[in-house]
Amino acid sequence: MSVANIHPTAIVAEGAAIAASATIGPYATVGAQVVLGEGVQVGAHAVLDGITHLAEGVQILPFASVGLPPQDLKYKGEPTRVEIGPRTIVREHATVHRGSVGGEGLTRIGADCLIMCVAHVGHDCVLEDRVILANNVMLGGHVYIGDTVFVGGGTAVHQSVRIGRQAVIGGMSGVERDVIPFGSCMGNRARLIGLNLLGLKRRGFGREAINALRAAYRGLFLGRGTFDARVALVAQDHGNQPQVAEILAFIEASSRRGLMRAGRQTHESEAEAA
């Protein structure tokens, strides 16, 4: 560890493993079980504690806290963890709590994520790569978010909710149920309003894939009959298309919160995207 990269006012506990190229700013606090990879930047007054591993290039900005105990009254100091993947940025005043014994004991954030100011990642959450949480987003414990999801500012996500990859959540939403991959939802309480069509186009999904997803969405959420019957029909008609198969697998997977269904804005959203 290079003393030149650590501000003299920072408090670094004996035992912390800090790469030579990592930097620690003024008045930051780094606990004894923290591991900082190459190029990690820790801003002024940030707090890193517990068994916390930051991969190369992670940035922790001023006053953020990572690895503090979970907000779980059952937690009694067990050795749970936080892992943050390469190049992820945790902005000012954001909080990332370590796992609990009621979960897997791990809070994990993937690579190239952006956790904006004052966002909260609760215990045992899993965020895959390229997830963006805008300002003041609140994730309850045990939330799962797939890759390349955007969550708008001020949104609250209930504990144990799953959000499938490439979904988009509108700002100021209250998300109580699982959101399908590629879905778009908003509102208090949030309801599906269609697909994340803009995101799909920006990320290079072709016309064939988008058309199949739109047909599947209409069949699942705007069709007639029971939901199970609609799932079976979509599987029959479009189940060979990879993204549709992903949605069907998401629906069939175990869920503690249940699946979010479409709201009244769906018809308008789909019409505008046509």
Where are these regions (language model features)?
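Structural signal for interior beta-strand "rungs" in well-ordered beta-sheet cores
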Residues: 4-191
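Terminal amphipathic alpha-helical/low-complexity segments used for targeting or macromolecular assembly
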Residues: 1-9, 14-15, 20-21, 57, ...
